[in-house]
Amino acid sequence: MLEQKTRYLQIAFNYDLDLVRRILPTIPRNDRILIEAGTPFIKREGAGGIREMANLWDGKIVADLKTTDGAVGEVELAYAAGASAATILGSAPVETLDLFLRRCTELNMDSMIDMLGVEEPLKVLLRLRKPPKVVVLHKGRDEETTRGKVIKYKHINKIKSKYNVLISAAGGVDLREARSAIFNGANIVVVNLVSRHDPWTGICSDENVAEMARQFLKTIE
């Protein structure tokens, strides 16, 4: 399970298994590195993609399901494939959120609520029977190209004043943004693996990904 006092780097794979097979074995094993099966990756490769990730990485695997309904089945699918954490959208019905959190607890998985598109994350949390392990403050991929869109760190103190949860910062994270996230109280920074032609910010898959991972870990210490 994730620990409150540790700062984590989450590296997101959003493309295909070819990229996973090429890059993942080069990343140094570290308890502070989480490997994410991104939503586009899961849609493309299915549960088998998560399973292959788990075979290549003996650390924590995050299944970015972004569940909106059918919570129990999706959590069980991710767990059976080897994931140790999974995400649900904060905009999902409260019944779905509660079922998701309960099933994650039963399976000893870390539950993550992704607040993508949610204006007031605290209001979502106040409706729940129990809080998640992680709250994700997320600037979406499509928002990255809109000038002035930012990760809303202003919510961190509000959330942490009421709940003992970890905060994850996602969306357009580079070394500078990672430093800002930690300064503002985040516990996890999510960095996308991107191609040179993408409009998004992250670690370019053509770079020395292992070295970039080390730089991020040093930055968020």
Name each model feature, range by range.
Residues 1-63, 67-72, 204-216:
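Conserved N-terminal beta1-alpha1 strand-loop-helix module at the mouth
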Residues 2-5, 73, 77-164:
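Conserved anion-binding
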Residues 30, 56, 81, 130, ...:
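Structural motif
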Residues 7-13, 33-37, 61-65, 86-88, ...:
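Hydrophobic faces of well-ordered beta-strands that scaffold small-molecule active sites
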Residues 43-65, 100-117, 151-171, 206-221:
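Alpha-helix-loop-beta-strand connector modules within alpha/beta enzyme cores
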Residues 154-189, 194-200:
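A C-terminal functional module that forms or caps the active site or interfaces directly
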Residues 15-19, 39-44, 68-70, 93-95, ...:
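Short, small-residue-enriched loops and turns at beta-alpha junctions
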Residues 83-95, 136-146, 184-212:
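Glycine-rich phosphate-binding active-site loops on the catalytic face of alpha/beta enzymes
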